[in-house]
Amino acid sequence: GFDLYCKMLRRAVDSLKGKKSGGGTATLRLDFVATEEGAFASGGDLAASFVPHSYMPESKMRIDAHRRMAEAASRDEIDQLRAAWRDRFGPLPPAVENALLCAAIKLEATRRRIPMVEVRGEKLMLTRGGSFVLIGGRFPRLTAPDPDSRLREVLTCLEKMPCR
């Protein structure tokens, strides 16, 4: 929801400035990631990917943090966010590290013209040009044993793909 809002806002601002909007950012559908505290608290073997209340107590700060991640245009910007938050709020909890990792996944997918990154079970389902990206006629498989490692594995798979 919030990513879509940021995307629409960015396109509206670009339109008002007379800029052509790029194709937007990639969409993530990862069945092993909880993007809200409530979903994570309900249990299950999920990777937390959000800014927790315990790390940034004010909702305005958390909203701004999510906005800044959604608007990051490079891996350097993501690293700058990580450093700024570490300086201001202390060591990043795993949920924030994972949220930054999801932002990096979106950037890498967008850079490689992959509008959709989806994981169902062990299958990594990437779309490019309206078709699924298959390796040897099959979807790539994730092998990492835990959800946090699976996020890193998705990013590694994308980094190995050629840009088109």
Show the residue positions of the predicted features.
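Accessory helical-bundle/CTD segments and flexible terminal tails appended to RecA-like ATPase motors
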Residues: G1-R164
